[in-house]
């Protein structure tokens, strides 16, 4: 049986990358939330 998680760097970056976050209002809110919190990394890839 094929496993459900088939990792691909491009797919992941396109869906959860910085530019994907910046493209939507809620994504920008998320980045600002992480900035306010003082996160070392804004995006977890």
Swiss-Prot record:
Protein name as catalogued: Large ribosomal subunit protein bL34
PROSITE patterns xrefs: RIBOSOMAL_L34
BP terms from Gene Ontology: translation
A Pfam family annotated for this UniProt entry: Ribosomal_L34
Gene Ontology, cellular component aspect: ribonucleoprotein complex; ribosome
Family (UniProt): Belongs to the bacterial ribosomal protein bL34 family.
Alphabetized UniProt keyword annotations: Ribonucleoprotein, Ribosomal protein
Gene symbol of the encoding locus: rpmH
Keyword set includes tRNA-binding: no
HAMAP family, alphabetized: Ribosomal_bL34
GO molecular function: structural constituent of ribosome
